[in-house]
């Protein structure tokens, strides 16, 4: 196997694993871990925490299944998933700042370490779907004053 083939397989496996993880997390939003997810909704969000948890769970299931099955649209799905991970990051920051215990994150150190993993999820979504190429193309096609 050459390098390109290995890279394609690695991306495929990473994309499917991320899709399965998102689907599983989304299902847990709707059931077993619902109360813990509600505790993570920042107090400044102007919506009912239960609605936020249910809606984000449905979105995670859709994104997870899309990562697995919509391979022809994988780059666009990857961009959306990365944007979703960025959008939920304030909830993780709120959990850290307010010292909210959930999912075994019961110390500031554990919550702080979790914050470091969120950018990795963004990178995972972009790399495994090859969405970087969309970003590069968009960046190159724009006229930049600093060129």
Regions found by a protein language model. Name each.
Residues 1-147:
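Membrane-interface extramembranous regions
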